[in-house]
Amino acid sequence: MRVAVIGGGPGGLTTLKHLLEAHKFVGGDPVEAKLFEAEEGIGGTFLKRMYEDAELVSSKYLTAFSDFRAREDDPDYLPAARYLEYLGEYATAFDLWPYIQLSTTVTAVRRKGRSHVISYATQDGKEGSWLCDAVAVCSGLHVTPNIPSIKGIDKVPKSFHSSGFKSREQFGSDTTVVVLGTGETAMDIAHLAVTAPTKRVVICHRDGFSVVAKRTPSPVVFPSLASQLQSPNPPVPVDTYLHASHKWGNLPGNVFDSLVKQGMWLMTGTSAGYDQWVGGYPSPRWHTSNVIFTKSSKAMPYISKPYRKDTILQRLRSSIVQVPIPETHGRHIDIAPWPSHIDSEGVLHFIDNGRPEYKRMEEAEVVRPDVLVFGTGYTQRFDFLDSTYPSTSDLDVRDVWRRDEPSVGFIGFVRPGFGAIPPLAELQAQLWVLNLLAPERLQPLLPQDEPHYRLGMPSDARIKYGVSHDDYANQLAVDMNASPSFMDAVRIGSSRKEWWRLPLVWLLAAEFNTKFRLCGPWKWDGAVDVMSGELWDVVKRRGGLLKQIVLSGVPLVVFGSLHLVLWIFTSLFKPSRW
């Protein structure tokens, strides 16, 4: 079988790797695979869109591929440049380079009988074609900038999309900077702007957002005794233990939603987000299973500063427990509704959203931006595919392929509400390759097993491909018979001296991809070492018994009890598949 991979980002690299290694795991003849990458190097968006102080928003423990881990001395959150280096090391470790064609743009994909013809052009002007049996589209979510139309934008001296942002120097000095959007990149840019020699920084949102901390907050209990009570352990990446809701109805998700909101209120005084006193989602939409969190919180102290409440209740709460609030050195970021237009004088006008920020901006000095940055995300285009091919909106099998076109897979086109795309792309690649080569080894891929992992996005949302990371990852593993049970973890770990480590990591940690290499068609001998070593150390970092109970014990007891009841119910009444 010959397979073309389009795109050399994380999704393309892991797809190429699994194609080349498939015969070792599922048998059969080796696959002939070739990866086409338009740029001069691999890495996708991490190659083209690095900017000052950029780092991953997901930890190295979650983001790293299952069988190629980040270095022990790497920080928890890799700088973008280091992650790019990691991808190069991955390609070297699995000998992918001979199968990668750099500086080669795929110009068209067309059908020839049951096969596909890849037409391509190199940067030096050469053209060619390659006949193959299957195509993996891995061109990435973050390629074509999404730039909304704003009347009067030509009145702003300098405007550009965040894809063109590199450093603070682009803001200039004594300038008014406006950032449109509240995603991670927009928040990073707003923080860089407010810590640069600018005059004023404004950030605009459409209909709310929710910021969460990447690292577990370290609240001070009874601040007057802080020096005695603060934990000596470094903060733990949140995505190494976050528990998602599961497929058995809404009750577990509602309990989790309540725990998250109450926890944020207890530590920061607000349940809208991490130290987020303004700009939250409207109540009907604000549920943890319905949103994509913003995992960049450095700008939040500057945004919340004018809105932070000083009531008797807040004073009482903060005297008992409080996350330290970073110093803003007298600066703040104005938050505003989405702009309606820019007038002939270059003044920005805002849509009246009925929120406190609109009233405050109406009473404040007019906003006349010198620099406007569109932190408004990206759209997906597949101009190289002709009209007979599916697009991402047509995918009806695990958001990877269309049921009547299994030879064309789309890898990496989901967005986790809290998590990382690369590990999900790895699981997608495993599922798609297995379906190509040994479909009999899969469980039935039923449509009714999909709604539970989808985020409940509103119909007018720009992003319609949101998923719950843990639920989606586990579903793909279940499809491949690669999701070990707790008793599997006990059995597999029983041969080791520290036999308890593996089952405890199974219980207390997130859905790391390495967990799904303990068994199944992609079983890897090194999985036990990673789970019982590196990932055990992460779980152990949480500190004492109290923190373990709060971070893992409470969710385990709550969700475990709910699932025990459901298990008894299904055992007694044996309903059909949910």
From Swiss-Prot:
Pathway annotation: Secondary metabolite biosynthesis; flavonoid biosynthesis
GO MF annotations, alphabetized: flavin adenine dinucleotide binding; N,N-dimethylaniline monooxygenase activity; NADP binding
Spans traversing the lipid bilayer: 549-569
| E.C. numbers | 1.-.-.-
Q: Where is the signal peptide?
A: none
Chief subcellular location: membrane
Q: Where in the cell is it found?
A: Membrane
Cytoplasm as UniProt keyword: no
Q: Which cofactor does it need?
A: FAD
In terms of Gene3D superfamilies, this protein maps to: FAD/NAD(P)-binding domain
Q: Which UniProt keywords apply?
A: FAD, Flavonoid biosynthesis, Flavoprotein, Membrane, Monooxygenase, NADP, Oxidoreductase, Transmembrane, Transmembrane helix
Pfam (any one): FMO-like
For membrane topology, the record states: Single-pass membrane protein
Phenotype when the gene is knocked out:
Impairs the chlorination of flavonoid at position C3'.
Q: Which InterPro entries match?
A: FAD/NAD-bd_sf, Flavin_mOase, Flavin_mOase-like, FMO-like
Functional description taken from the UniProt entry: Monooxygenase; part of the gene cluster that mediates the biosynthesis of chlorflavonin, a fungal flavonoid with acetolactate synthase inhibitory activity. Within the pathway, cfoE is responsible for the chlorination of the flavonoid skeleton at position C3'. The pathway begins with the PKS-NRPS hybrid synthetase cfoA that uses benzoic acid or p-hydroxybenzoic acid as a starter unit with four rounds of chain elongation using malonyl-CoA to form the chalcone skeleton.
Q: What is this protein called?
A: Monooxygenase cfoE
Origin organism is Aspergillus candidus
